[in-house]
Amino acid sequence: MARFFQPKKKTQLETKHQSVLVERMDHNGAGIAYQKNKPVFIDGALPGEKVVIQLTESKSKFSRAKLIKLLQPSELRLKPFCKHFNQCGGCHLQHLGYSSQVEHKSQSLTHLMSKYQTANTEVALPIVGDESGYRRRARISLFVDKKTQLLQFGFRKKQSKQIENITDCAVLDPRLNVLLPKLKSLLNTFSSLTSLGHVELVLGDTGPVMVLRHLKPLVEKDEQALMTLMTLAKEEGATLYSMPETDKLVRLVGDAPSYSETGVTLPFEPNHFIQVNQKVNQQMVAQAIEWLEPQADERVLDLFCGLGNFSLPIAQQSAFVVGVEGVDEMVQQATANAALNQLSNTEFYQANLEEDLSSQLWAKEKFDKVLLDPARAGASGIVDQISALGAKRVVYVSCNPATLARDSESLEKQGYQLAKLGMLDMFPHTSHLESMALFIKA
């Protein structure tokens, strides 16, 4: 007997306004209320608040809702300091006092890692920096408005591909922030606006760095606009690059950028990864060294080493450091950085850290200690191989507590115990949190 496809009936979404009591916050900073034991996630709502909501999504196990009105605001609620707060997708916790943000993130981390904590696990004090003006890096999106034919200049709106026009960002370092209105005005003088891709801003010790990504070669009549941009860079003591292709940078004005970290100098290209928050990064590196306790006669392995942000400061402690990174260009830069700082007790290798490493020459050696600093996806490809490397101590620096928790299970199975755990607030006023965990072989 033939069966005919019958589409499932769509659940009728209840769109009328409802009042609810917010009981807690989730790890992403959304308020959680309950209706018939089903959680309702409400962006912008705080625990203890009575709010009016409108459902925007209803699933079998949860719902999402839009905050319509505050009936009873929390005493922890503050007026956001940025006029773009409700539109820009960058910050989403400015309505919560900063100390409460730090407390919430710390609690979220310990909750996610509770399975691996013992009575002996030490929870370190959170590492924090400045509440505003902390970002030393930003990518400015560019888009031509079809109606006005003017360049839209700013950041993506919340849950949208549209751009919120911004010429003043409170979390951007003031030395970069001051460039925004000047750049927007100048870029609008280009005749071929649709050929402009984005602007990358980075701050090094040598000053601001500006990168203009253009999708097509600039036409001849835009040469004058480019010359004006070069003049602006000189006036601001900035370095200016053009980026005609994804992997090609052309330095037009200024010196090659670098930053200093715990006594070492790290030159970098503006397309290289560096931590956004310099003050938190400095404390993070210092804490990693303190937890690792590198000794002069030990071998330390730094996985996902990048430019040498951890490797070179550790090498200054006289330990022999082997850094491994997936991107060959970064390996070359780390090697050059070690030579610049006269650190001969280092070696750097390129390797795919998602594959079996037993065939790698460097992996055939034993290591006393290991540091991992993976991307958000975590270190699932290599974490199962840590014990085979012989490490007694492992410091795991994570930008995603969910993958840290997942990888902790593997380390626990290999005989490591969670000795220390700490939260690092690299991105104030967002729900993103960095963390550091120390595992010691039992």
From Swiss-Prot:
Binding site for [4Fe-4S] cluster: C82, C88, C91, C169
EC number: 2.1.1.190
Root EC class: transferase
GO biological process: rRNA base methylation
Residue spans crossing the bilayer: none
Domain TRAM: 10-69
InterPro entries reported for this sequence: 23S_rRNA_MeTrfase_RlmD, MeTrfase_TrmA_AS, MeTrfase_TrmA_CS, NA-bd_OB-fold, SAM-dependent_MTases_sf, TRAM_dom, U5_MeTrfase_fam
UniProt xrefs under Gene3D superfamilies: 2.40.50.1070, Nucleic acid-binding proteins (2.40.50.140), Vaccinia Virus protein VP39 (3.40.50.150)
Pfam short name (any one): TRAM
Signal peptide: none
Keyword Acyltransferase: no
A molecular-function term among this protein's GO annotations: RNA binding
Keywords attached to this entry: 4Fe-4S, Iron, Iron-sulfur, Metal-binding, Methyltransferase, rRNA processing, S-adenosyl-L-methionine, Transferase
Amino-acid positions noted as binding S-adenosyl-L-methionine in the UniProt annotation, renumbered to this chain: Q275, F304, N309, E325, N352, D373
Annotated CDD domains: AdoMet_MTases
Taxonomic superkingdom: Bacteria
Catalysed reactions, as listed in the record: uridine(1939) in 23S rRNA + S-adenosyl-L-methionine = 5-methyluridine(1939) in 23S rRNA + S-adenosyl-L-homocysteine + H(+)
Active site residues per record: C399
Protein family according to the UniProt entry: Belongs to the class I-like SAM-binding methyltransferase superfamily. RNA M5U methyltransferase family. RlmD subfamily.
Function: Catalyzes the formation of 5-methyl-uridine at position 1939 (m5U1939) in 23S rRNA.
Protein name: 23S rRNA (uracil(1939)-C(5))-methyltransferase RlmD
